[in-house]
Amino acid sequence: MIIVSRAIVLHNTAYNDSYSIAHLFSRESGRVSYLIPRSSKRGKSGGSLRLLISPLNELEITAEHKQHRDLHFIKEAKLCSLHGRIQSDPVRNSIALFLAEFLYLILRLPEADTNLYDFVAFSIDKLEEMDGPMANFHLAFLFRLLVPLGLIPDLQFGGSVIPRWFDPADGRFVPNAPAHGRGIPPHQSTYLQLFSRITFDNMKAFRLSRAERRQVLDYLVDYYRFHLPPFPLLKTPDILSTLFD
């Protein structure tokens, strides 16, 4: 079956001497894996295709999908838009690598989700186009991503004015520390309501130290880890921590 779709590059790994495997998030088919020629000798389009397979590149692809196969072939591909600033700016590029790694871990199903796809594509365009401080971009992305994923926590205190523990497993405030030992303590959980309002447009108003930003990121990732297992350790947060004061 021939499909035509927009698709976002998540990850590319070596497969054998002839091919690598590119993992793409397709608007029409969800996550799909493709064999990418490692040498232009395997076809006149192999070399150009290989150059397009870069994290968070959005492509328009024509691909051949065969039933009962996990690996497919891309017949034609072109960039939907040029993200020159993401490629050339170290800060944007580091954020892009984090987003790509994160999405690679959580987007696993070969099922179309157009709302989710459109949000991710919109976010990539924002990363390319925005000016000014970018230190909170990844936090705004993770908070806003909860909506299309259907993982929005209940951030109401339930009538209580006393700060309470937040249980990431249940996604709600609780009176006591959760038994699993990974709850967010009261003196920090109150910030969740504040940060739940963060967007790409207002993120510059959220002033955080490097340590505070990393703490918020760790709490967010842990929330995802509870709700989308299995969730291995991320490699890119340490890179982000070195960039922003």
Swiss-Prot record:
Q: Where are the transmembrane segments?
A: none
Keyword Cell inner membrane present in the record's keywords: the answer is no
Which terms in the GO cellular component ontology are assigned?
bacterial nucleoid
Gene Ontology biological-process annotations: DNA recombination; double-strand break repair
User: Which of UniProt's keywords are assigned here?
Assistant: DNA damage, DNA recombination, DNA repair
For the keyword DNA damage, the answer is: yes
InterPro entries listed in its UniProt record? ARFGAP/RecO (IPR037278), DNA_rep/recomb_RecO_N (IPR022572), NA-bd_OB-fold (IPR012340), RecO (IPR003717), RecO_C (IPR042242)
Fetch the Pfam families from UniProt. RecO_C, RecO_N
State what this protein does.
Answer: Involved in DNA repair and RecF pathway recombination.
Similarity-based family? Belongs to the RecO family.
The name on file for this protein is DNA repair protein RecO
Q: Which gene encodes it?
A: recO
